[in-house]
Amino acid sequence: MNALPSTIVAIATAAGTGGIGIVRLSGPQSVQIAAALGIAGLQSRHARYARFRDAQGEVIDDGIAVWFPAPHSFTGEEVVELQGHGSPVLLRQLVARCIALGARQARAGEFSERAFLNGKLDLAQAEAIADLIAAGDLRAARAARRSLDGVFSRRVDAVSESLTRLRIHVEAAIDFADEPLDTLGGAQVREELTRTRALLAQLLRDAERGRKLRDGLHAVLIGPPNAGKSSLLNALAGSDRAIVTDVAGTTRDTLHEAIQLDGFELTLVDTAGLREGGDAIEREGMRRARAELQRADLALIVLDARDPQAARDALGDAIDAVPRRLWIHNKCDLLAVAGPMDADAIAVSAVTGQGLEHLHTRLRELALGDGIESVDGEFSARTRHVDALHRAEQHADAADLELRYEQLELAAEELRLAHEALGEITGKLSADDLLGKIFSSFCIGK
């Protein structure tokens, strides 16, 4: 366990008033500070009623104190939690008193950082705490809970252990360079690498799914002016979030709205209509629309059902950047007779609601790419995890190629780089600046 001499303190409950507020202490002076507050006779993991007093002996608040001795606490250090009334004034006074007694104000995420540094959890698990708190729906919360329980980390460790075995074999073969690789178990090494690459590819697919569970799907409504994009956003959101008029080009800026699809969060982005010309403000809106497309998981291409082909032509190559697209023929209620429909398009009316149920179904199907049903063991992941897995996969693929040509030194280097990429996920090979960025994004008191 790493020795961290300072004792830190922070409010651990959410900002604002509430029935209960918690102040958390962690560090070697936690019990002594609690005693100076007037809390005597603390027993391990026993709740004790006490009055919390200031320097003059006046009662700041009363409540429950709980002591978690090291190393059997969240941070691995001496921890005392003071549970009083949820008054911000009283909680701040209690923190100030703890600081006067020798503690210091905790940095954002410092409790979780200490838990990581003391080996109570790895980096992916620490991040899962923040993801669990910020989860926008039940499914994302359950996925974050699994990551906190170590589901993701154990799978990363399994691939990492396989890479370790491979590196040992390849490094040993380098030491016997005069011997052909096959006489040194080269066939078994290649088989092991094939299995490892398969495990890594599956882990990457599952992490992509976990990233979408955490972040939700980013769907951009794109199309020519006056196709009904804003009306469709309002219809899907169930409220008048966007301004709607008969004037083409009403939408000048992007508008984000999160909706729930069977427990999955989908962020809809309304954008300015794409067309040639327009004034300076409209052109800036179109530039932002194209920028949103670059970040989109899904493009919802909204066309006027009365002349969809002309609307398609007007878009040009703007949608080429998005691999996943859903074509929507809006205003189908204005058709005197049903016109020709593209096989991949959905006919809807944002005004009457016609076709919206079908659209919801297709959005649910597209939400996770390979089905909408919850998968056993699905976990939460972040973009940085997915990026690290991509790099690990690329290096493992390169190692396989080098082994085929018996370029052992190059194969060993590629395996090392793959191993390092995986280590970034759990924090076993992470630079200090990366750790600082990650934990600084946490809440104070976590």
Curated annotation (Swiss-Prot):
PROSITE patterns: G_TRME
Pfam family, one: MMR_HSR1
Cofactor: K(+)
Positions annotated to bind Mg(2+): S230, T251
Cofactor note as given: Binds 1 potassium ion per subunit.
Main location: cytoplasm
Residues the record lists as binding (6S)-5-formyl-5,6,7,8-tetrahydrofolate: R24, E81, K120, K446
Protein EC: 3.6.-.-
Function: Exhibits a very high intrinsic GTPase hydrolysis rate. Involved in the addition of a carboxymethylaminomethyl (cmnm) group at the wobble position (U34) of certain tRNAs, forming tRNA-cmnm(5)s(2)U34.
Assembly information from the UniProt record: Homodimer. Heterotetramer of two MnmE and two MnmG subunits.
Protein name: tRNA modification GTPase MnmE
Species whose genome carries this gene: Xanthomonas campestris pv. campestris (strain ATCC 33913 / DSM 3586 / NCPPB 528 / LMG 568 / P 25)
